[in-house]
């Protein structure tokens, strides 16, 4: 069995809950992707065209800085990457995270939380950030997703 990591970014705590349940269900290590400058409630106001999140998501080259890196990334074969869906894709801080490592030969599996949006163009936007990695199609979960739901999803991946 390969060593697994569940890395996640959570703005509201919902993705954190799903990530912790996933890690517990599959016996994986956990790493929180934290922005160097934490997001405020105003930063996350998607209705404000001048909010930080809106500005970042409007710029495909935006790469918000992350506070810390995972030192032993080379030990992991499979990396689950979790995030809330923003504008039908992963927040650009996920690109920052992926681009911070050599992921060649690793399996990357995105998972997301959303109140109603699907994965949209997430894989299309993440693929350039993890060259040489096997990027699987992910799944969206809601805040009520149980460990059993997550385990059932993992079974479909044939890892």
Set out the residue ranges of the language-model regions:
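A structural micro-motif
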Residues: 26-28, 106, 133-134
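N-terminal beta1-alpha1-beta2 submodule of the flavodoxin-like/Rossmannoid cofactor-binding fold
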Residues: 1-78, 88-90, 95-99, 148-159
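Glycine-rich, N-terminal phosphate-binding loop of Rossmann-like dinucleotide-binding domains
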Residues: 83-84
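Short, conserved loop/helix-junction motifs that constitute active-site signature segments
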Residues: 73, 99-105, 129-130
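Acidic catalytic loop of the alpha/beta-hydrolase fold
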Residues: 87-88, 116
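Short, glycine-/small-residue-rich phosphate/pyrophosphate-handling segment
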Residues: 109-146
